[in-house]
Amino acid sequence: LAQLIGTIRKVKKKLNRGLYIEGLLMSMFDQRNSLTHKVAEEIKKHFNEQVFKTIIPRNVRLSESPSHGKTIIEYDKNCAGAKAFNKLGNEFLRRNRKTQ
């Protein structure tokens, strides 16, 4: 993550001064894995408000949908992954309404 932030800073400095990070999204989150929780805590500690509150869980249906040539909403709109992406979309829109 630190390397990615560094790369974004370099691109911003040399190529696109208007570039900014809209937010950090935690995905493939495995609720059963303690390391996942520790990493999430560290990310929230360092990046605080930049971290989206919505977390995309590890979900079999999410991994299956591309092989069927469908979005997750088309494939299984009621699975946990689809619901999380809908929630993320709403969170993204709320954030952007506040900044406009």
Language-model regions: role of each:
Residues 2, 40, 80-84, 99:
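A sequence-composition feature that detects small, non-aromatic residues
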Residues 22, 64-67:
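Generic signal for short, ordered secondary-structure residues
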Residues 57, 63, 73:
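Nucleotide phosphate-binding site architecture
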Residues 66-87:
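C-terminal boundary of histidine-terminating zinc-finger modules
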Residues 88-92:
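Hydrophobic "lid"/C-terminal helical patch
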Residues 93-100:
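Generic C-terminal helix-cap and adjacent flexible tail
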